[in-house]
């Protein structure tokens, strides 16, 4: 399996890429001047990065295919986007604006499915849970919020004036710099870092603070060890600290050790589980590969050459065997001969304009896969059906019938969930009324 490291900078140094095993430099993608957390490999099928002007007055989102160095698709949202994230399958792309608004696009069509006000100040980081059912956002205002994708698309909740988020964490006193989620499913924990020099461990299921870990310096970046016992914290004092997740005391310093990069501030981290390697980026434009067990330096990758070295502010690990794969969400743009999907729409379409914009969820029957695992809009399913109709083979006819049934079942499930929400809300309101009379 070929594993590639990609890295970007806040100045226009482009996106560098290297073979992780050999350190060989690969294709460089230009132009790119991305903010922190503004680079993502969408389903590991193509690259996307938000772009900011020097004064943050305008912004854009660029797409690159893996085979061409120049950006092929450019989108211009209504406001500058900082943080950018995609779910595992590459179905959705989510952007966090400087206003605190969050935008959710369907990748295959470019449609803006949902826009909502997430925070009081700019969104600094976004991350999906392992099963893609939850989105976690961090902000310059110090808050962290957990969003359920199903709840976001429940218009009944919005009409009732209910909060859209599942959890709201406000214990950080300064801007949130990074967020990671472990792989524990319903027992997962969230780890956040902030300019207040702390990392906090939160319970995702209980919605409460578990640990508060104080560090000697501001933590810019986080990475999780796959074992789930420790995490790595990249600091502004050029050190990478090792923090304990399962600390014995509720509060207090739980720093197990550190390794020094002997350079400038650590700005980003990534962990490659396939090779058990830790990758760091720093302000001096250097990408370092570490052995986390021995804490020894393995190799150095230079992002920018010459006198004009910009800080490395984003690192991603991409598995090239996955890049070559395709899934059903790619049908609509690949059928048009494009390597990557169309530009992102600026505005959310009014519901009354088309009922095809309804997002439906397809829970596989008798499957262990969570019901949140597959999200497709109805018009995207329609488009797939039309494309299959044009192909005309017996196999595609069978696939077309399957998609029709999937479409119908999704609409029925959407109606059932709507009724369940209404019934549950009615029960809660009745209980509150009974409690008030007592």
UniProtKB/Swiss-Prot annotation:
Residues 394-434 form a coiled coil. WD repeats lie at residues 36-74, 76-115, 118-157, 171-212, 214-253, 261-300. It holds the Pfam family WD40. The keyword Coiled coil applies. SUPFAM superfamilies: WD40 repeat-like. Keywords: Coiled coil, Repeat, WD repeat. One of its GO terms (cellular component) is Cul4-RING E3 ubiquitin ligase complex. This is Protein ROOT INITIATION DEFECTIVE 3. Involved in meristem development. Acts as a negative regulator of the CUC-STM pathway in shoot apical meristem (SAM) neo-formation. GO terms for biological process: negative regulation of shoot apical meristem development.
């Amino acid at each position: 399996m070929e594993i590639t490291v990609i890295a970007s900078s806040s100045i226009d140094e482009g996106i560098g890429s290297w073979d992780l095993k050999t350190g060989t430099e690969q294709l460089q993608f230009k132009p790119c001047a991305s903010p922190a957390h503004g680079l993502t490999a969408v389903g590991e099928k193509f690259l996307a990065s938000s772009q900011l002007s020097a004064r943050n007055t305008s912004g854009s989102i660029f797409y690159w295919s893996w085979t061409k160095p120049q950006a092929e698709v450019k989108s211009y949202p209504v406001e500058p986007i900082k943080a950018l994230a995609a779910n595992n399958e590459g179905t959705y792309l989510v952007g966090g604006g400087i206003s605190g608004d969050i935008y959710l696009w369907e990748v295959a069509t470019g449609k803006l499915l949902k826009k909502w006000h997430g925070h009081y100040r700019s969104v600094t980081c976004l991350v999906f849970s392992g099963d893609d059912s939850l989105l976690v956002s961090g902000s310059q205002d110090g808050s962290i919020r957990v969003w359920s994708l199903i709840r976001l698309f429940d218009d009944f909740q919005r009409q009732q004036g209910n909060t859209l988020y599942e959890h709201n964490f406000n214990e950080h006193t300064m801007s949130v710099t990074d967020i990671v989620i472990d792989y524990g499913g319903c027992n997962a924990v969230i780890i956040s870092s902030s300019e207040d020099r702390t990392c906090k461990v939160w319970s995702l299921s209980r919605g409460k603070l578990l640990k508060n870990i104080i560090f000697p310096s501001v933590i810019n970046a986080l990475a999780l060890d796959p074992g789930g016992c420790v995490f790595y914290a990249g600091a502004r004092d050029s050190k990478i600290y090792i923090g304990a997740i399962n600390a014995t005391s509720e509060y207090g310093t739980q720093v197990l050790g550190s390794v020094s990069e002997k350079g400038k501030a650590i700005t980003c981290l990534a962990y490659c589980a396939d090779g058990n390697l830790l990758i760091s980026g720093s302000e001096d434009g250097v990408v370092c590969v570490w052995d986390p067990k021995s804490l020894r330096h393995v190799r150095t990758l230079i992002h920018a050459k010459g006198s004009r070295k910009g800080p490395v502010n984003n690192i991603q690990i991409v598995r090239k065997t996955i890049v070559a794969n395709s899934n059903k969400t790619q049908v609509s743009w690949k059928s048009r001969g494009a390597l990557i999907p169309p530009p992102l729409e600026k505005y959310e379409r009014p519901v009354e304009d088309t009922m095809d914009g309804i997002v439906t969820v397809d829970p596989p029957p008798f499957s262990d896969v969570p019901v949140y695992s597959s999200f497709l809009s109805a018009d995207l399913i329609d488009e797939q059906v039309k494309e299959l109709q044009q192909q005309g083979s017996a196999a595609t006819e069978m696939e077309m019938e399957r998609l029709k049934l999937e479409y119908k079942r999704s609409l029925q499930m959407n109606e059932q969930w709507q009724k369940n929400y209404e019934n549950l809300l009615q029960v809660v309101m009745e209980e509150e009324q009974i409690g008030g009379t007592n």
